[in-house]
C-alpha cells in the first residue's frame, strides 16, 4: 500500500498583509487549518494530527505570527518534526509596504497586535518587521500583497501554492459577474447569461448556486442540462490534451450577470465532475461571493 502523502504550509508575515485571507483560502481547499498556534506546540500538534488520520493524506496549514509567542524565529524544531514524518513543509511569508499596511489599518480601524506596548502604528509595524525578519529570511516564498485586493490574493494563493505543481494538472473552476469584468487569468471562459436565471424566482433570489434549491431549479431546465453536457464533453477532451502538453494548471471561468446563481452552480458542478473523473487537484473560487 502506498504510504500517505502529507503537506504542511506555515503561513506567517506582517499583521495586515493578508495572512488570514490566505489561511481561509487553504481551509476552503480542504486543508486542516490552525491559526496562532504557539511554535513550541507545533511538533506535538503534528504528531497528534497524523495519528488521528495516519492512513490518509494530510494537508495542513498553520498560521504563525507575533502572537504565537516569543520563539517564532526558532524554525529548527518544526522542520525536524516535519522531516521525521515525511511531511513536505513550506514556509510562506506575507508582506506589504508600510504605506499599504497603514491604509489597511485606517480602513478597518483595527488595532495592531503590538499596540499594547504603547507604540504608534508606524512604530508597531517597524518593530514587527524586526521581530519577523528571521521568518522572512527563511521563507521559501515572500508574497508582497501591496497591490492585491482580497480576490486577487485568494486567486494567487490558489494557483501558486494551494494547488500543487507536479505532473498532475491542477484545475480551478471560477465564477464571476460580467458587470465586474472577466477574469484576465482564465484559460477558458463560458457565458451562462443565456441560461434561465434563478434571480427572477423570489424564493431563490437570496440563495446562491451552492444551495440545493438553486441546484434543483437549474437541473429542471433543459437548456442547463444541454449546456452542461456540451461543456463537459469539451473539457473532458481538452483538459486531457492540456495535461499531455505539460500544462501545470488551468482556470475555467463561468460568468453570469450577478455572479451568484448560474455561474456558481456551473463552477461547482464542473468541479464535482472533474473530481469524479479522477482529477485530484481541483478547486473552486467564487469571486462575487468572497
Curated annotation (Swiss-Prot):
InterPro entries: P-loop_NTPase, RapZ-like, RapZ-like_N, RapZ_C. ATP binds at residues 13-20. One of its GO terms (molecular function) is ATP binding. Keywords: ATP-binding, GTP-binding, Nucleotide-binding. It comes from the Bacteria. GTP binds at residues 65-68. Belongs to the RapZ-like family. This is Nucleotide-binding protein PD_0634. The lineage of its organism: Bacteria, Pseudomonadati, Pseudomonadota, Gammaproteobacteria, Lysobacterales.
